[in-house]
Amino acid sequence: FEGDPLFFFFFSVRMHRSHPLAKLPALTYDDLDGQTIISKGRAYDCFRHHIDKYFLAPGRKIHILAETADESIIRTLLLHNKVINIGYDYADPLYPHPDIVSRTLKEEISGQMIYLVSNPQVRKTKAACLFRDYLLEWMKKKAVRG
């Protein structure tokens, strides 16, 4: 397999604006110690990897209230509970609410690169080639515009 880098997703922590952590400009894993979270969950391998590596292995404690990929459930729980959501920054503008704020997770590993992956051993269709070229060109233009 080979991959073309598309963009970097930063980790983002969303919470109700009245949550005590909302007063901080950015958060660390230590800030999240002892917190109640709602997140995508074990269905996503990266969730389990990050929870194990950055929370449980160093001895930090978290309470997982719920695991769901449903943004409407996540937003409802953020609005009505003192929970936080650990996710990626792309979700911040997709599901805006005036009472939900987002803080960047400032750590050595603060996100991950997303790649367009292909198998060079498989012949691509013309449509697949056109889509790949379009997507890569679109990403370049988007990066230039900011």
Residue map of PLM features:
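Beta-alpha-beta core module
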Residues: 1-4, 9-10, 72-121
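Flexible hinge/capping segments at coil-to-helix
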Residues: 1-37
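Generic preference for hydrophobic
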Residues: 13-14, 37, 64, 102, ...
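Short helix-loop capping/hinge motifs at secondary-structure junctions, enriched
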Residues: 18-28, 107-110, 121-127
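Structural motif corresponding to alpha-helix initiation and N-cap regions
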Residues: 26, 70-71
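Secondary-structure junction motif
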Residues: 36-58, 124-126, 132, 142-145
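Short beta-strand-to-loop elements that line the ligand-binding cleft
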Residues: 40, 60-70
